[in-house]
Amino acid sequence: MAEEKQTSLKPLTIYFYHTRLTRESYEEWKEYKFPGHILYGLPLLEKHGIRSVMHKCRYFSSRLRLMLYATKEILFCKEKYQVLYATSFRGIEPVIFLRALGLYRKPIVIWHHTAVVNSSGFAREQISRLFYKGID
């Protein structure tokens, strides 16, 4: 009988991006004080051995400031992760475009809550296609 080689896989680590306070919500969920569906599967990931690096959420009135902050946090995160897992693309649009252009190599997984529709103009449609190319 041939011996099977056992390979030890590194546990998967994701960067969990959410537009609300995730760490606090997750701790409240553990104490049955917060609904789990708002955590978009985070409690189940841990059960399957998937480690999470939590995004440090901050609120901004300006979407541009949110994008700059979130992009900086994601690109300069000191903790190692293999996948960017987001509950929304709001705030991480620059990272998605970097992925579409091949400048950000980690896969991006997003819960997209609305239908993808064709844009009205040619230029908008091309930008939209490029944007969605950045989402795995």
Name what the model sees in each region:
Residues 75-79, 122-136:
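Membrane-proximal helix-turn-helix segments that form the acceptor-binding/catalytic region
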Residues 83-85, 102-118:
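Active-site proximal beta-strand in glycosyltransferases
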Residues 52-69, 85-87, 123:
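A short, charged, and often flexible helix/loop element on the N-terminal side
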Residues 81-82, 98:
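Short, high-confidence coil segments that cap the C-terminus of an alpha-helix
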Residues 58-60, 90, 113-119:
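Short beta-alpha junction loops
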